[in-house]
Amino acid sequence: MLGSGSAGNSTLVSTSHCHILIDGGLSARQIVVRLEQCGVTPEQLDGLLLTHEHGDHVCGLEVFCRKFAIPIYCNAQTAEAIRCFSLGEHKNWRIFRTGTEFTICDILVQTFPVPHDAVEPVGYAFHAGNRGLGFITDLGYPTKMLIERLREVHTLVIETNHDEKLLQNDLHRPWPVKQRIMSRHGHLSNVAAASVIEQLLPGKIERVVLGHLSRDCNTPELATAAVRSQRERVARADLEIFCALQDAISPRFHIGETLRGDFQPTFESALFNTAAL
């Protein structure tokens, strides 16, 4: 992840043949700077995938896409919502139907609906060779379809938005906002995310990356502790747990070993290893 949290989200998924950006929730300048820190220029991007139209996922989109002619992949509802306030002149839309799959270069992209208070939010599963990456942020609860889509992934990016006690005791958010966040179309708490991960264990999953943390109502320590507790309960000490950060990126994060010759899936993310906590 180039950056992940309540203030903005953008993620780079790369193989040796392909570069895909997920969401544009950082400023256009920050997207460019952080891409270049990963050794990728905007001109090298093969596509920009959107999860939904909320500002923390698209706020940099208009300026970024005005400067760089990058195809935008999303469903029709999300495209229409974005066109209402920006990108009205953008021509390079690649509209998909939620639930379908398609390829970008050598990456198979699977799409599926997620419950969130946006017009038609989606999650993604990326497959290349025999390795898979699941990507779900901004959802209120896990559907059966979502769980099934993620059973074949080896690395999962999942939101751990808030600690329930910190959110309930927060003095800056009015009660209706707290209700929205905790609703079935809001955001996953640490405990709820840990429950999703448990449903994928045992299975192919080897690593989880926790993202979209609230600055005010969560900490990396609380998020990782919740998932670590679940890991110990199901006796999967081998499961790696990382946490994404809002204001930094990480070195290359490898999803798998070298596949099909020189093909090697990588995941650019702002991470720290929980062993250091």
PLM features: what roles do these ranges have?
Residues K144-L245:
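Cap/insert and terminal regions of metallo-dependent hydrolase folds
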Residues M1-C38, V122-T137, T155:
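Conserved beta-strand hairpin/beta-sheet module of binuclear metal-dependent hydrolase folds
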